[in-house]
A protein has these predicted regions:
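Divalent-metal-activated hydrolytic enzyme cores
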Residues: 55-64, 69-87, 122-197
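Structural motif
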Residues: 3, 94-98
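Short, well-ordered beta-to-alpha junction loops that form the rim of enzyme active sites
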Residues: 97-104, 178
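Residues lining hydrophobic/aromatic ligand-binding pockets adjacent to catalytic sites
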Residues: 2, 11-30, 46-48, 136-140, ...
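Catalytic phosphate/metal-binding cores of nucleic-acid and nucleotide-processing enzymes, i.e., regions
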Residues: 115-117
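Short catalytic/ligand-binding loop motif for oxyanion handling, primarily in non-cytosolic enzymes
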Residues: 13-15, 54-56, 103-109, 113, ...
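Short His-Asn-centered micro-motif
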Residues: 6-8, 100-101
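Short, surface-exposed acidic-centric catalytic microdomains
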Residues: 20-66
Length: 197
């Protein structure tokens, strides 16, 4: 068996914190296209969305430090335990972990960072009640006010997953950039091809 461990927002666009924009629809269509091409040796593990478990949906943009301040670390450990149990019991010959560039939880090599003391925590409740159009108009303002920035490093979940599984000889790590979806889709497709050799 080969195992594809993938962020749920790459399969369905509706987990995206502010609600989907066109790029999320395109990304999920591309990823589902690759999944449809997998042979019977592959199994898909789309773990529970850690951000949804912590804050429900929708939520305003925030950094990994803000997520940690709100209690994300317990959820991350629970999800990593779940993934680890599957890996231990199923013993896949190949594991491909797929995350999302810039995500505070599922960023593989790139995440979002800020000082959690600068964050407007009251925006969480306000954002929840906004309609989609209002959310899409206001999320950039929250990014600016909170001084959220994209940095090198892993999101909270992928930091935990890498600590536990990066030494496995059969594990590979891919980060999908929703702003450059063609490159990410091609990287994933190439890794899948390599497993057939």
């Amino acid at each position: 068996m080969k195992l594809l461990v993938i962020a749920p927002c790459l399969i369905t666009p509706f987990y995206v914190y502010r609600g989907p924009k066109e790029k999320e629809y395109i990304a999920s269509i591309g990823v589902r296209g690759i999944i449809s091409e997998l042979d019977k040796e592959w199994q898909i593990l789309s773990y529970p969305c850690p951000e949804f478990l912590l804050l429900r949906w929708p939520r305003p943009p925030m950094s990994k430090e803000v997520m940690a301040h709100l209690g994300m670390e317990k959820i991350v450990k629970d999800i990593a335990d779940f993934i680890g149990r599957i890996i231990t019991e199923e013993k896949p010959e190949r594991i491909v972990f797929v995350g999302v560039k810039g995500s505070p939880t599922c960023g593989v090599f790139t995440t979002t960072s800020s000082n959690p003391e600068d964050y407007d925590y009251s925006s969480i409740q306000r954002f929840f009640y906004l309609g989609k159009e209002e959310r899409l108009k206001s999320y950039k303002e929250i990014i600016e006010k909170g001084n959220l920035r994209i940095v090198k490093g892993s999101g909270l979940l992928f930091t935990e997953l890498m600590e536990r599984f990066s030494k496995l000889h059969n594990a590979q790590w891919i980060e999908i950039d929703k702003d450059n979806i063609k490159e990410g889709i091609e990287s994933l497709r190439e890794v899948i091809r390599e497993t057939r050799r």
